[in-house]
Regions:
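Structured C-terminal cores of nucleic-acid metabolism proteins
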Residues: 8, 13, 18, 23-220
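Glycine-rich phosphate/pyrophosphate-binding loops
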Residues: 1-5
Length: 220
């Protein structure tokens, strides 16, 4: 029994959508073949976009196409890294899964008996849940500081790209500082918009309490 960091296969439809999206930037990935071949093609994509203006957007869309990595005693490999067996610990930061790995390595290297699988699977589940809570808190704190920062720039114009499309409006990520805000649907005209389209916006509203940024499109 051992805690692994596992990462399942991505949904085939999401892979196809990702490949369609990155084609507009001149990239492509494999959407069929062995999991190792597909994984390596995605890693090549992430290498190819480094230091390019589209890096942040392509990385974000790529992550949305992937399953979330988690901890488990039931090993299925790590798709993103193309490893059949993968676990880890960090230094000097110590997360609880790091401590489990340390303790079990010490136990097994000393010839100790295996541990209860059910107990460690429960600990892995708890660690995965806490990791997600921490990630959500990090995103919320980053968003708070973005809104605070842009709140001092009301009325200013910035160039960006459409990073998301929902029934409520368009999300735009700014090229200069990677802040993201929304252009509400009520403020949009009849034009056609798609992910990755370049746009120019004006900072319209910044609600720090709700951590919301509203942009207005500037027609050029």
């Amino acid at each position: 029994v051992f805690p692994y960091r596992i990462h399942d296969l991505p949904d085939p439809d999401k892979l196809e959508n990702l490949n369609w999206f990155i084609n507009r930037f001149g990239y492509k990935i494999r959407t069929s073949g062995s999991k190792t071949e597909i994984s390596k093609s995605i890693n090549r994509l992430l290498d190819d976009i480094k230091n390019k203006k589209e890096q942040n957007l392509v990385e974000t869309v790529s992550l949305r196409a992937m399953q979330k990595a988690r901890y488990s005693t039931h090993n299925i490999g790590h798709y993103g890294l193309a490893f059949d067996y993968y676990t880890h610990f960090t230094s000097p930061i110590r997360r609880f899964p790091d401590m489990m790995v340390h303790r079990l390595l010490t136990r097994y290297l000393a010839g100790g008996r295996t541990v209860q699988e059910a107990k460690y699977e429960e600990l892995c589940d708890h660690s995965s849940e806490m990791e997600q809570i921490a990630a959500n808190a990090e995103r919320a704190s980053v968003k708070y500081k973005q809104v605070e920062f842009m709140g001092e720039r009301l009325g200013m114009e910035f160039d960006g790209v459409i990073s998301g499309v929902t029934e409520w409006g368009l999300y735009v990520e700014l090229n200069e500082n990677k802040c993201e805000g929304m252009v509400p649907m009520r403020d949009l005209g009849d034009d056609y918009y798609d992910l990755g389209d370049p746009v120019t916006i004006k900072v319209a509203r910044a609600n720090l309490e709700k951590k919301q940024l509203d942009f207005a499109l500037i027609e050029k």
